[in-house]
Curated annotation (Swiss-Prot):
Catalyzed reactions: [protein]-peptidylproline (omega=180) = [protein]-peptidylproline (omega=0)
Keywords tagged on the record: Endoplasmic reticulum, Isomerase, Rotamase, Signal
Motif Prevents secretion from ER in this chain: 182-185
GO annotation (BP), single: chaperone-mediated protein folding
GO MF entries: peptidyl-prolyl cis-trans isomerase activity
InterPro entries from the UniProt entry: FKBP2/11 (IPR044609), PPIase_dom_sf (IPR046357), PPIase_FKBP_dom (IPR001179)
Entry protein name: FK506-binding protein 2
Activity control mechanisms: Inhibited by both FK506 and rapamycin.
Occurrences of domain PPIase FKBP-type (ranges): 41-129
EC number, UniProt record: 5.2.1.8
Signal peptide range: 1-20
């Protein structure tokens, strides 16, 4: 019985820790249909506007420069929130990424961004190097849009942590489920 209670406690703690995470929230604001989505390793072109969640103050915008930002996705050239939040995106798609400090700049001041800030980026995928731009952008209805990548990652993480917790519980039960008496002491 103690083993069961311990296992349930471990699973609950792990799940709460994962679900309480505010590292990355992805809202698809303009879902688009396409044959080819972004993947890690792609060089992509993105328009964006970055604001501080705390006060809505804009700290950067590629629209102001009239030039999209280009980088290799998943290569660590940008903050983790971008490397993960812009995967599986179609050309023409728009997303709002809400990025917690651990997926942003952490405890560092960076230009006008205070340490520990949660960032909000309105993003638009303008292009993927080597992938022709579609002649027209076909939007999806909100009901056709897939679940956000962040939600899928949370489910995946909870499953992973639950599996690890179950393995620990099995080990504990195996170690304490010894019915043989040890009178050596």
């Amino acid at each position: 019985m103690q083993g069961l209670l311990l296992s349930l406690s471990l699973l609950a703690s792990a799940a709460v820790g994962v679900l309480a995470s505010d590292d990355l929230k992805i809202d698809v604001t303009l879902p688009v249909e396409c044959d080819r989505v972004t993947k890690k390793g792609d060089k992509i072109n993105v328009h964006y506007k970055g604001t501080l969640k705390s006060n809505g103050e804009k700290f950067d915008s590629s629209y102001d420069r009239q030039s999209p930002f280009s980088f290799k996705l998943g290569a660590g050239m940008v903050i983790k929130g971008w490397d993960e939040g812009l995967v599986d995106m179609c050309i023409g798609e728009k997303r709002t990424l809400t990025i917690g400090p651990s997926y942003g700049y952490g405890d560092r001041n960076v230009g006008p961004i205070p340490a520990g800030s949660t960032l909000v980026f309105e993003t638009e995928l303008v292009g993927i190097e080597g992938v022709p731009k579609p002649e027209s952008i076909v939007t999806k209805s909100a009901t056709d849009a897939p679940e956000s990548t962040a939600s899928a990652k949370v489910v995946e993480k909870v499953a992973s942590v639950a599996k690890q917790a179950a393995e620990v519980v099995e080990t504990i039960i195996a170690d304490t489920d010894d019915t043989q008496e040890h009178n050596e002491l």
